[in-house]
Amino acid sequence: MSFSQESGAHHHPQDYAGLSDEEDEIDILGEDDPCSLKSHFYLQPTHSVMGDSEMLSPSKLSCTESESDSSGESEGGTSKDSSTTPTGSKAKRTLVKPPYSYIALITMAILQSPHKKLTLSGICDFISSKFPYYKDKFPAWQNSIRHNLSLNDCFIKIPREPGNPGKGNYWTLDPASEDMFDNGSFLRRRKRFKRHQQEFFKDGLMMYNSLPYYRPYSAIQPQPVLQQTSLTCMAIPETLPMSTHLAPYPDIKRKVSYPAQGVHRGFKAQDADNHPNNSQSKCSFSIENIMRKPKEPEPNIQSFNSHWNYNHVFQRPSSCLLPAVLNLSTGPLLANTQGARQYNLIQFPGCY
């Protein structure tokens, strides 16, 4: 028993001394490596040196082979991936979306153009050439540019000039939207630009002054409702009553005198027939003439209707147009007539 213990005690130091180099090599792989755990598991003091070496050799070889295989596979995999992956994919991963909105991109494109106007395709070409991110994703964002052009008031659509072939309309910036961005920086916009529809048109037909059917881009000037050239064609007879109040309709028939010249020639013929040129018919003071009511001549119906068409001047609301006509600057029609100066003093009730 003592010999076995001595022999065991004698052989144990040699075993550990002979395997010290192997243990150092195994520890280099890492303490958590499964091969190191196997080596520690096989290192038992009850076995001989040859048995230990024979038992350790397969495990060591298997570990080294597995390590070489694993390292070879990983190296081969990495080399294979590196060889198969193109250089463009790495560049695509590095592309970052620019921090500009679509409105800012469109504004950049329009401002850099010589004529300060571009078509949709021209805007897309500018964005693709300046920003590789949008060049890589070109078809996807073209509709977004189109929607921003149509929905934002800061962009104005300009039709193509006649004789200028091409596809699509031009787009430009509204002159009032120049201060849309803070201090000229396209990264931040102050507020959304809104155009007042009563002052400006949305789709500008106003950019070409040389063409007759376009008008210059400016605020709409209100046109006067009454024009002097059209009102001068309306002739007002000088024999209208000078009363300051409106008489009832039957009284107007009696008070309005017939014009000496004009369209009412039928009245003149009847007046000449019914009133002979003798003083007796005009001045008769007999009892019969006093008691008998003189018979009034019946005028021509056609001329009567045409004559009383002047009554629309005295009826409301058409009578309110008379002061506007008479208060105009004295034109050639009413300049030299005494009745025109008197009409200016007439006050028409109900006109306000």
From Swiss-Prot:
DNA bind region: 97-191
GO MF annotation terms: DNA binding; DNA-binding transcription factor activity; DNA-binding transcription factor activity, RNA polymerase II-specific; RNA polymerase II cis-regulatory region sequence-specific DNA binding
Pfam families for this protein: Forkhead
Triggers of expression: Strongly by siamois, moderately by cer1 and weakly by wnt8 and nog.
Biased composition (Low complexity): 73-85
Biased amino acid composition, Acidic residues: 20-32
InterPro entries (UniProt xref): Fork_head_dom (IPR001766), FOX_domain-containing (IPR050211), TF_fork_head_CS_1 (IPR018122), TF_fork_head_CS_2 (IPR030456), WH-like_DNA-bd_sf (IPR036388), WH_DNA-bd_sf (IPR036390)
Record's keyword terms, sorted: Developmental protein, Differentiation, DNA-binding, Neurogenesis, Nucleus, Repressor, Transcription, Transcription regulation
Localization of this protein: Nucleus
Tissue: Maternal expression is localized to the animal hemisphere of the cleavage embryo. In pre-gastrula embryos, zygotic expression begins in the presumptive neural ectoderm. During gastrulation, expression is confined to the superficial layer of cells in the dorsal blastopore lip (Spemann organizer). Also expressed at a lower level in the paraxial mesoderm but not in the notochord. Expression is subsequently lost until after neural tube closure when expression re-initiates in the tailtip within the entire neural tube and paraxial mesoderm, but not in the notochord.
GO biological process, one term: cell differentiation
Disordered: annotated segments: 1-32, 54-92
Function field: Transcriptional repressor with a role in dorsal axis formation and neural plate expansion; maintains an undifferentiated neural ectoderm after neural induction.
Protein name per the record: Forkhead box protein D5-A
The organism of origin for this protein: Xenopus laevis (African clawed frog)
